[in-house]
Amino acid sequence: MAQNFTKLNPQFENIIFEHDDNQMILNFGPQHPSSHGQLRLILELEGEKIIKATPEIGYLHRGCEKLGENMTYNEYMPTTDRLDYTSSTSNNYAYAYAVETLLNLEIPRRAQVIRTILLELNRMISHIFFISVHALDVGAMSVFLYAFKTREYGLDLMEDYCGARLTHNAIRIGGVPLDLPPNWLEGLKKFLGEMRECKKLIQGLLDKNRIWRMRLENVGVVTQKMAQSWGMSGIMLRGTGIAYDIRKEEPYELYKELDFDVPVGNYGDSYDRYCLYMLEIDESVRIIEQLIPMYAKTDTPIMAQNPHYISAPKEDIMTQNYALMQHFVLVAQGMRPPVGEVYAPTESPKGELGFFIHSEGEPYPHRLKIRAPSFYHIGALSDILVGQYLADAVTVIGSTNAVFGEVDR
């Protein structure tokens, strides 16, 4: 089968079919339930085995980067919620971290504690969501029901803090919008206990389930060479045995002060990746347990103090003329960062999420580029799927934990 297609015409119009009873071309998605209307795979099959896979993306493209180049820095923050919408706080933070690096802001310690707690809470919510829907795709429905019940407790905590359950907008450039509500940390401790129990329950349902293991073991194997050549990150990379975690390699916020491990896999298959998600939940619980006592030892400020870029506290805006004028200018005209470029990587639940910003000293970025992990992992399907059975395609796609809000952007 020869494929000489151009970008101007649909791919199927440019495929020359040769008479071969053992080979066929199959459209997988975008209507297939596991592709959620956002992924099309053109699969070439020989019998039941995939001999070539071509991912086609773009069904959720909204021009997020170009939007960022036409908004002020603060206006763009809620848009980042819509990238990886299962872990929106991670997107908020990655963008804020890039802008803060450009501005050279010093973040108050209480804001750092709150941010790190929110990031790890968000990581657990994202991981438990992935495990539940991945199990549902493979056919284990009970896990979905138990996991979503526990996930609701985490979403309740996010709602108590910022008022939203999915698109949080819980981070600000320079800090956080709110201090923790009364008794919020007590609710967090209770949630950590619920998460531990849920994890044990899921492991009891899956770890010794021979059907689950047959569907995942030696399926979707990623080698170290493949992971490095495709620019994989996160659990897709660590599943191959490479212990690379940006929280350890280039620590931000309070991670350099925290004691936690970076779990790695041995075989790089789908089962290894599932195990790593479960182990990372333990590490997030461990991190939050270290952060809770830190909170009481911090001072009250939760926003950086820099009148050129950050508005004064609301009490000052309501009582002081200069603070009101400065706030008006920042809202109406936007902050003007210095001329320069910055790339700030973070470890999101999916992998390396980074924002590149090129500033010309204007109220909006001259160029904004988002380095989203799911984009690279979906591209790698053209290698991972080769040699797999068609029945295992859903397992492999699910094990990448890709979210198409950040693939298409």
Swiss-Prot record:
It catalyses: a quinone + NADH + 5 H(+)(in) = a quinol + NAD(+) + 4 H(+)(out). One of its GO terms (molecular function) is quinone binding. The keyword NAD applies. NDH-1 is composed of 14 different subunits. Subunits NuoB, C, D, E, F, and G constitute the peripheral sector of the complex. NDH-1 shuttles electrons from NADH, via FMN and iron-sulfur (Fe-S) centers, to quinones in the respiratory chain. The immediate electron acceptor for the enzyme in this species is believed to be ubiquinone. Couples the redox reaction to proton translocation (for every two electrons transferred, four hydrogen ions are translocated across the cytoplasmic membrane), and thus conserves the redox energy in a proton gradient. Belongs to the complex I 49 kDa subunit family. This is NADH-quinone oxidoreductase subunit D. The lineage of its organism: Bacteria, Pseudomonadati, Campylobacterota, Epsilonproteobacteria, Campylobacterales. The gene is nuoD.
